[in-house]
């Protein structure tokens, strides 16, 4: 599962996702990409599940770039614990994704395979996405 090696702080605020993406909003590496169309928090397991779906459909051809990384700890209190007594322990890691952000890029496969692979990957994510090409 994806998570940072070291962090400055153990816990983070919940925060809100405002505006659209300015960084990582254009294709930099591959020819085809999956672009986020809504603001959402994506967890590490979902990113990994989407990556596995991508690589399996591509049958290890081409190359995949993951443009997001879960760097925010999400804490959770144990089951059946009363309110109060501080914030819970970090449970998993998440990434705040703004609309317009590139999630995955792929290269070295045909457009039909790329479209199908990215469609399968998008099914693993809790967000509305869009297939885009570098040279449209």
From Swiss-Prot:
Pfam family, one: Ribosomal_L16
Keyword vocabulary terms for this entry: Ribonucleoprotein, Ribosomal protein, RNA-binding, rRNA-binding, tRNA-binding
Listed PROSITE patterns: RIBOSOMAL_L16_2
GO cellular component: cytosolic large ribosomal subunit
Presence of the UniProt keyword Cell membrane in the record: no
GO-annotated molecular function: rRNA binding; structural constituent of ribosome; tRNA binding
InterPro entries: Ribosomal_uL16, Ribosomal_uL16_bact-type, Ribosomal_uL16_CS, Ribosomal_uL16_dom, Ribosomal_uL16_sf
A GO biological-process term: translation
Domain of life: Bacteria
PANTHER family: 50S/60S RIBOSOMAL PROTEIN L16, LARGE RIBOSOMAL SUBUNIT PROTEIN UL16M
Purpose of the protein: Binds 23S rRNA and is also seen to make contacts with the A and possibly P site tRNAs.
Family stated for the protein in its record: Belongs to the universal ribosomal protein uL16 family.
Subunit: Part of the 50S ribosomal subunit.
Descriptive protein name: Large ribosomal subunit protein uL16
Organism this protein belongs to: Pelagibacter ubique (strain HTCC1062)
Record lineage: Bacteria, Pseudomonadati, Pseudomonadota, Alphaproteobacteria, Candidatus Pelagibacterales
